[in-house]
C-alpha cells in the first residue's frame, strides 16, 4: 500500500485529528512507511492534546507497557482518566485495571469495580469478563453467582476465551444457573477454538466422559493433544495416560514417557509418579528400581500424597533406596495428613509395632480409626486387635485425637469418631 505521507502530514500539521491518528498508527506499526516509535508518540500526543479520547487511551496503554516511552503508570493514569471521562470503554477498562492492581495510584477495588461497570455497559469484553470474575469471587463486591454467569456469558458471546471457559465451568457445575452440560461443552468448544489450552483440556475431559457430548476417545485424544502442545501440564499428563493405556490412540509407552516427562518439567507431581511407575514396571524402559525411587521421591516432594505413601513403602522394604523405617514413617505421616487411607492404616500399624517411631497405641488407634473411610475389612480387623490391647480411657483419648486430626487437616470427615 502506498501512503501519501506528505499530504497526510500536512493535514496532521493543520490540526486534523483523524490524520494525526492515522499517521501515529502508521508510524507505530511501520505500515507503508518505516517504523518510528518517536514519530508515533509525537502524533498520538498531538491528537491527545486536541482531546482525542482514542489517542489519550492509546497513550495511556503505551505508558503502561513502556512501548516507545519509559514505563510510567502515573502518566498512564493521567491519559486514561481523560479518555475514560469521555466514555472511551478501552480506557475505562485499563483505568479499572490500574486501580485493581494499585499501579500508578493507591489500590482501590471499589473504584476498579465502578470503572469496569462503566466499560462493560459500553460493551467492552474484557471489562465484562473482569466483572464476571469479581462477582464469582466476591472481589470488590458481594459474591453473586447469577451476576457472574450473566457477565461471563456477555463477554463469551463477544469471543472472550477466558469468559467462554468460565461460563462453561459454571454451566457444567450449575453455579449461578441451571446445570447444563451441553451448554458447558459448547462454551468449552468455543474457547478451545481460540487456542485456549485450559478449555481444550476441559473439552477433552468432556469427550472422555461423555458429559454433554457423545463419548468419543478420539476427540478426547485430539483436544488433549492440542492443549498439551500449548504447554498445559495437566493435558501433557493426561495425554501420557492416553498413550499409556491406548485410549483414542494406539498404546505407545515411548510417547507416554515423553509427555509425562514434559509435565514433570513443570513440577507436576502426578507426572513424576507415573514416570516412577513406568521405571518400576519396565514400561517402555528397562526395569530400574533406583530410577523409579528417584521419581517417586520427586513426586512426593511436590506434595502428591499417593507418591508419599509409595515412597514410604519403598523405604520400609529397602526397594531402590536404603531401608529406613523412620523415613518411611515420615512419608506416611505426610500422606496420612492429606487423607490417604492406606498411609493412615500403615502409620497406625507402625505406631502399634513401634516401627520407625515410638510405640503408641493411642496414636495407632487414632490413625486406624480414620483409615476406616476406606471401608476395608482388613483395616477393621487390625483396629480391633489394637483396641483389644487398650483400656476405655485410652480408647477415649484415641477417638479425641482422631477428631482433632480431622479438624486440623480437614480430612476423612465422613468417618464419625465418637468421643
Model-assigned labels for residue ranges:
Residues 1-4, 377-419:
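Terminal, low-structured helical/coil segments at or just beyond the last alpha-helical repeat
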Residues 1-31:
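N-terminal segments that cap or nucleate solenoid repeat domains
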Residues 18, 54, 90, 126, ...:
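Start-of-helix register in tetratricopeptide repeats
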Residues 22-29, 58-65, 69, 94-101, ...:
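Hydrophobic face of amphipathic alpha-helices that form TPR/SEL1-like repeat modules
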Residues 26, 47, 62, 83, ...:
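TPR/TPR-like alpha-solenoid repeats
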Amino acid at each position: 500500500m502506498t501512503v501519501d505521507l506528505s499530504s497526510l502530514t500536512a493535514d496532521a500539521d493543520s490540526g486534523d485529528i483523524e490524520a494525526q491518528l492515522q499517521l501515529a498508527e502508521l508510524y507505530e506499526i511501520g505500515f507503508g512507511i518505516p517504523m518510528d516509535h518517536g514519530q508515533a508518540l509525537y502524533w498520538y500526543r498531538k491528537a491527545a492534546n486536541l482531546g482525542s479520547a482514542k489517542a489519550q487511551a492509546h497513550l495511556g496503554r503505551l505508558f503502561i507497557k513502556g512501548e516507545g516511552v519509559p514505563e510510567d503508570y502515573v502518566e498512564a493514569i493521567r491519559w486514561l482518566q481523560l479518555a475514560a471521562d469521555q466514555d472511551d470503554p478501552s480506557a475505562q477498562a485499563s483505568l479499572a485495571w490500574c486501580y485493581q492492581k494499585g499501579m500508578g495510584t493507591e489500590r482501590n477495588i471499589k473504584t476498579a469495580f465502578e470503572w469496569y461497570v462503566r466499560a462493560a455497559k459500553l460493551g467492552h469484553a474484557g471489562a465484562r469478563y473482569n466483572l464476571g470474575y469479581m462477582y464469582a469471587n466476591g472481589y470488590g463486591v458481594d459474591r453473586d453467582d447469577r451476576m457472574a454467569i450473566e457477565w461471563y456469558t456477555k463477554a463469551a458471546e463477544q469471543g472472550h476465551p477466558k469468559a467462554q471457559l468460565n461460563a462453561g465451568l459454571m454451566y457444567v457445575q450449575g453455579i449461578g444457573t441451571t446445570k447444563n452440560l451441553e451448554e458447558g461443552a459448547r462454551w468449552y468448544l468455543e474457547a478451545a477454538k481460540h487456542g485456549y489450552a485450559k478449555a481444550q483440556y476441559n473439552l477433552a475431559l468432556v469427550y472422555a466422559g461423555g458429559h454433554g457430548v457423545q463419548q468419543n476417545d478420539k476427540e478426547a485424544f485430539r483436544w488433549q493433544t492440542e492443549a498439551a502442545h500449548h504447554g498445559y501440564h495437566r493435558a501433557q499428563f493426561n495425554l501420557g495416560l492416553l498413550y499409556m493405556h491406548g485410549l483414542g490412540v494406539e498404546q505407545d509407552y515411548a510417547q507416554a514417557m515423553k509427555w509425562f516427562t514434559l509435565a514433570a518439567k513443570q513440577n507436576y507431581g502426578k507426572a513424576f509418579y507415573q514416570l516412577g511407575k513406568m521405571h518400576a514396571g519396565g514400561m517402555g524402559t528397562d526395569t530400574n528400581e533406583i530410577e523409579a525411587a528417584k521419581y517417586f521421591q520427586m513426586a512426593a516432594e511436590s506434595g502428591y500424597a499417593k507418591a508419599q505413601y509409595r515412597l514410604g513403602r519403598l523405604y520400609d522394604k529397602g526397594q531402590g533406596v536404603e531401608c529406613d523405617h523412620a523415613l518411611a514413617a515420615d512419608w506416611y505421616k505426610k500422606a496420612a495428613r492429606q487423607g490417604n487411607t492406606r498411609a493412615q492404616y500403615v502409620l497406625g500399624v507402625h505406631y502399634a509395632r513401634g516401627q520407625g517411631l515410638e510405640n503408641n497405641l493411642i496414636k495407632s488407634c487414632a490413625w486406624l480409626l480414620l483409615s476406616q473411610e476406606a471401608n476395608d475389612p482388613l483395616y477393621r480387623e487390625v483396629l480391633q486387635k489394637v483396641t483389644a490391647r487398650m483400656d476405655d480411657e485410652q480408647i477415649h483419648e484415641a477417638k479425641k485425637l482422631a477428631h482433632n486430626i480431622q479438624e486440623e487437616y480437614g480430612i476423612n470427615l465422613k468417618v464419625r469418631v465418637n468421643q
